[in-house]
């Protein structure tokens, strides 16, 4: 089994990051449709064995009610025009164009994984199960692997999606296990959980890092993507590498 370790975003300079880690989940692609030249530059700067995964644009996953749209670079009237068409895996001309853009980003970066991270407001219900299925039926996925994060969903409803479609169930393995484990496991480690709240400002202990390692060994996926998303992500990622 192979364990790849990285962070959700670049918490340090890219040069320092490239020197120490071989994986990153790009966050900029979530907030806005960024210039392709920037991605070409990153691919050129990174080592040949460095892997980028892409967090899909919020226009696919988040409605315009989300505060994250403030970072989209769009004016209020431009966001307002998108209100009826974006988020919650809606399928229409606009969102399909967004998806095509993500595929283009993946090609530039030589990425094989695109993450769809749904907000907690995307509730676990029949309507959203069907909406997720409808989206996955309509998007091109031949050259990439979709990893899907459905926060707070029951196993029963997640199975309706992950057993029908060839997509990966993204979880924080500190609190959950994937619906199914085959070739790829993708885990995002957010920090500490207090009831229904995530404390991102949290540093994992050596004991917790060892526990994560042991869970990965037990689940025994061929390729394991371990992405730290807490405030101490870079420090914890380096510490985790040392114990592998």
Model-based region annotation:
Residues 1-244:
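Residues lining hydrophobic/aromatic ligand-binding pockets adjacent to catalytic sites
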């Amino acid at each position: 089994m192979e364990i790849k370790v990285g962070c959700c975003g670049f918490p340090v300079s890219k040069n320092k990051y490239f020197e120490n880690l071989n994986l990153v989940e790009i966050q900029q692609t979530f907030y806005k449709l960024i210039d392709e030249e920037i991605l070409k530059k990153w691919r050129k700067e990174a080592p040949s064995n460095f892997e980028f995964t892409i967090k899909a644009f919020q226009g696919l996953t988040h409605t315009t009610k989300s505060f994250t749209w403030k970072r989209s670079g769009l004016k209020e009237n431009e966001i307002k025009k998108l209100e009826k068409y974006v988020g919650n895996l809606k399928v229409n001309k606009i969102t399909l164009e967004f998806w095509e853009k993500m595929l283009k980003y993946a090609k530039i970066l030589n990425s094989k994984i695109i993450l769809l991270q749904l907000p907690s407001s995307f509730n676990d219900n029949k309507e959203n199960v069907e909406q997720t299925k409808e989206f996955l039926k309509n998007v091109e996925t031949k050259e990439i692997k979709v990893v899907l994060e459905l926060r707070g969903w029951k196993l029963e409803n997640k199975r309706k999606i992950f057993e029908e479609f060839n997509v990966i169930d993204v979880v924080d393995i500190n609190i959950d296990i994937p619906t199914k484990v085959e070739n790829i496991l993708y885990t995002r480690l957010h920090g500490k959980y207090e009831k229904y709240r995530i404390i991102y400002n949290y540093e994992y202990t050596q004991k917790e890092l060892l526990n994560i390692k042991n869970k990965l060994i037990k689940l025994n996926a061929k390729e394991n993507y371990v992405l730290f998303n807490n405030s101490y992500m870079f420090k914890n990622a380096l510490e985790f590498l040392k114990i592998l």
